[in-house]
A protein has these predicted regions:
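Long, low-complexity, compositionally biased polyampholytic IDRs enriched for Lys/Glu and Gln/Arg
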Residues: 359-392
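C-terminal segment of classical bacterial N-terminal signal peptides
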Residues: 45-54
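Short Cys/His-rich micro-motifs in 6-15 aa windows
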Residues: 434-438
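Sec-dependent N-terminal signal peptides
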Residues: 13, 33-44
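A short beta-strand micro-motif
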Residues: 413-417
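N-terminal secretory signal peptides that target proteins for export/translocation
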Residues: 1-31
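Residue-level hotspots at or immediately adjacent to binding/recognition sites across diverse folds
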Residues: 56-358
Length: 438
């Protein structure tokens, strides 16, 4: 498609710019005089607005929410537009779900095990437990309907993650089999851990699975590129490392013990550096979202949350209550935390749920509004614009215009034969029968 044809397509689609485009094509002197207001309106109608004001999940201001029941909510995950929490002890409904972190609904589980951890991956929620016989795994495609699955062994499965097409769970018990993996969350296979430490947390990031433990001597970290073969790594201290997360190119682990060193970080999962926590609380969980690491704990007075933009420098935040905050996750603009006990609310949130969806909807609405305004302007000005075009062309009835040729007027020689006009490259001869015109 040549320049003229592209111009024709533009004109056919955007009549509001007729006067400006044609005046440029036919009279180069008009280029400097051309205004861009019409083109600006049209371009605005072609794109969604990306500069809308957005709220953010800051991890600073927290709000208490009412759980579905006063169960011991031990873990929470987010996936497919839903927050899902599981409990280690309950009177009923050992699972609860929420689309916004505010309104929670109890769900029935296939067994009343002590569900210790949950993860989402490949369209599936998978939870693991520390109790039960041959049924320490359950899965759900929607967080509502759950199915019991056979675990590789009856170990105390305390953590699970998903990465590289694989679910990987780790445990605090067992002999040489404290890891199990599954490609689908249904069929599980025992794997040999680097050591028989109490592996209580695992994450995946940058092509690597990283697990941390609360026992062991200088080897409280292990890593694996495939979830099958594991290697011991040196931890910075023999703390009770209870949670690990990956974000912004960094692995960050937190512990419930230690003095001034309850955080450690690593860019590769292998080499770790001690960091100072905001307080010597018993930090039990950490997550990353919206450019922020957030950790929660079960001890401390009014400061059971700490946040960090880089995993290195940490700041204490005020929790809604001094509850036993055991797990935190992030999803769609919202941090959500659950507790196993304490007074008042057993859920707290920070941020605004649905930022992505709301921003998209608002952008689409704004684009539609701008497009409608452009269309109204086009209709109102079309007659006036066409009248101005007639004024720009002295003898439009005597001129045969080919846009593919007309665009060449900006840089070519004009050749005339009767009522027909053509343009050739400067320096070239006019076609036979045509006369060069200045």
């Amino acid at each position: 498609m040549n320049i003229g044809e592209r111009a024709l397509l533009f004109l056919a689609t955007n009549l509001g710019s007729v006067r400006h485009i044609l005046s440029m094509l036919l009279f180069p002197s008009q280029i400097k005089k051309a205004k861009v207001t019409t083109v600006t309106v049209i371009l605005a109608s072609m794109f969604s607005v990306s500069s809308l004001s957005q709220a953010s999940a800051d991890g600073i201001t927290w709000t208490g929410q009412t759980a579905a029941s006063t169960n011991q909510w031990r873990a929470i995950a987010y996936g497919n537009g839903l927050f899902v929490a599981v409990a280690t002890a309950a009177t009923a409904n050992w699972v609860m779900t929420s689309p916004d972190g505010i309104t929670w609904t109890g769900r029935t589980t296939p067994s009343n095990n002590a569900w210790r951890a949950i993860a989402y991956g490949n369209g599936l929620f998978v939870a693991v437990s520390t109790s039960g016989t041959g049924d320490r795994v359950m899965t759900s495609p929607d967080g509502i309907s759950w199915t019991s699955r056979s675990s590789a062994s009856d170990n105390n499965w305390g953590a699970i993650t998903y990465g590289n097409g694989l679910f990987v769970a780790v445990s605090t018990s067992g002999t040489g089999d404290r890891v199990m993996t599954s490609p689908d969350g249904i069929t599980w296979t025992s794997r040999t851990s680097a050591s028989d430490n109490n592996w209580g947390a695992i994450t995946y990031g940058n092509g690597l699975f990283v697990a941390v433990s609360s026992t062991g001597d200088g080897d409280r970290v292990m890593t694996s590129s495939d979830g099958i073969t594991w290697t011991s790594r040196t931890s910075v201290a023999n703390n009770f490392w209870l949670s690990v997360a990956h974000g912004n190119g960094l692995f960050v682990a937190v512990s419930s013990t230690g003095v001034g060193n309850r955080v450690m970080t690593s860019p590769d999962g292998i080499n770790w550096t001690s960091r100072t926590s905001a307080a010597n609380n018993a930090w039990h969980s950490i997550t990353y979202g919206n450019g922020l690491f957030v950790s929660v704990g079960i001890t401390g007075t009014g400061n059971r949350i700490m946040t960090s933009p880089d995993g290195i420098n940490w700041t204490s935040r005020t929790s809604v209550a001094d509850n036993d905050w055991y797990s935190v996750t992030y999803g769609d603009g919202l941090f959500a935390v659950v507790a196993t006990g304490g007074g008042g609310h057993l859920v707290m949130t920070s941020g605004v749920i649905g930022l992505a969806a709301r921003t998209t909807a608002a952008a689409n609405a704004e684009a539609a509004r701008v497009a409608a305004a452009a269309e109204a302007a086009r209709k109102a000005k079309e007659q006036k614009e066409l009248t101005e075009i007639l004024a720009l062309i002295p003898s439009i009835g005597e001129l045969t215009l080919s846009l593919g040729e007309a665009t060449k007027s900006l840089y070519s020689t004009k050749c005339v034969k009767g009522k027909t006009t053509k343009y050739v490259n400067k320096g070239s001869k006019c076609p036979k029968g045509y006369v060069k015109k200045k």
